[in-house]
UniProtKB/Swiss-Prot annotation:
It comes from Arabidopsis thaliana (Mouse-ear cress). This is Photosystem II reaction center protein Z. It is a multi-pass membrane protein. Belongs to the PsbZ family. PANTHER family: PHOTOSYSTEM II REACTION CENTER PROTEIN Z (PTHR34971:SF2).
Amino acid sequence: MTIAFQLAVFALIITSSILLISVPVVFASPDGWSSNKNVVFSGTSLWIGLVFLVGILNSLIS
Protein backbone atom coordinates (compact mmCIF):
# COMPACT_ATOMS: atom_id res chain seq x y z
CA MET A 1 0.00 0.00 0.00
CA THR A 2 2.90 2.33 0.70
CA ILE A 3 4.24 1.82 -2.82
CA ALA A 4 0.87 2.80 -4.31
CA PHE A 5 0.80 5.93 -2.14
CA GLN A 6 4.32 6.89 -3.18
CA LEU A 7 3.53 6.36 -6.86
CA ALA A 8 0.36 8.45 -6.54
CA VAL A 9 2.28 11.29 -4.88
CA PHE A 10 4.98 11.07 -7.56
CA ALA A 11 2.32 11.19 -10.31
CA LEU A 12 0.72 14.20 -8.60
CA ILE A 13 4.05 16.03 -8.47
CA ILE A 14 4.82 15.27 -12.12
CA THR A 15 1.33 16.30 -13.24
CA SER A 16 1.57 19.52 -11.22
CA SER A 17 4.93 20.33 -12.80
CA ILE A 18 3.62 19.70 -16.30
CA LEU A 19 0.54 21.85 -15.71
CA LEU A 20 2.67 24.58 -14.12
CA ILE A 21 4.63 24.89 -17.35
CA SER A 22 2.00 24.09 -19.97
CA VAL A 23 -0.97 26.20 -18.84
CA PRO A 24 0.82 29.59 -19.07
CA VAL A 25 2.29 28.55 -22.43
CA VAL A 26 -1.18 27.70 -23.72
CA PHE A 27 -2.60 31.04 -22.55
CA ALA A 28 0.34 33.01 -23.96
CA SER A 29 0.32 31.45 -27.41
CA PRO A 30 -1.93 32.95 -30.06
CA ASP A 31 -4.91 30.68 -30.70
CA GLY A 32 -3.51 28.36 -28.04
CA TRP A 33 -6.55 28.21 -25.78
CA SER A 34 -9.05 27.27 -28.46
CA SER A 35 -6.84 24.52 -29.86
CA ASN A 36 -5.58 23.11 -26.53
CA LYS A 37 -8.63 23.55 -24.33
CA ASN A 38 -9.34 19.81 -24.11
CA VAL A 39 -5.75 19.02 -23.13
CA VAL A 40 -5.83 21.58 -20.30
CA PHE A 41 -9.17 20.28 -19.04
CA SER A 42 -7.93 16.68 -19.20
CA GLY A 43 -4.79 17.56 -17.26
CA THR A 44 -6.80 19.44 -14.67
CA SER A 45 -9.19 16.51 -14.28
CA LEU A 46 -6.26 14.14 -13.86
CA TRP A 47 -4.75 16.46 -11.22
CA ILE A 48 -8.02 16.63 -9.26
CA GLY A 49 -8.38 12.85 -9.42
CA LEU A 50 -4.83 12.39 -8.16
CA VAL A 51 -5.46 14.79 -5.27
CA PHE A 52 -8.43 12.71 -4.15
CA LEU A 53 -6.50 9.46 -4.67
CA VAL A 54 -3.58 10.69 -2.56
CA GLY A 55 -6.01 11.77 0.15
CA ILE A 56 -7.76 8.41 0.20
CA LEU A 57 -4.51 6.45 0.19
CA ASN A 58 -3.13 8.67 2.94
CA SER A 59 -6.13 7.94 5.15
CA LEU A 60 -5.68 4.21 4.57
CA ILE A 61 -1.98 4.26 5.42
CA SER A 62 -2.18 6.45 8.53
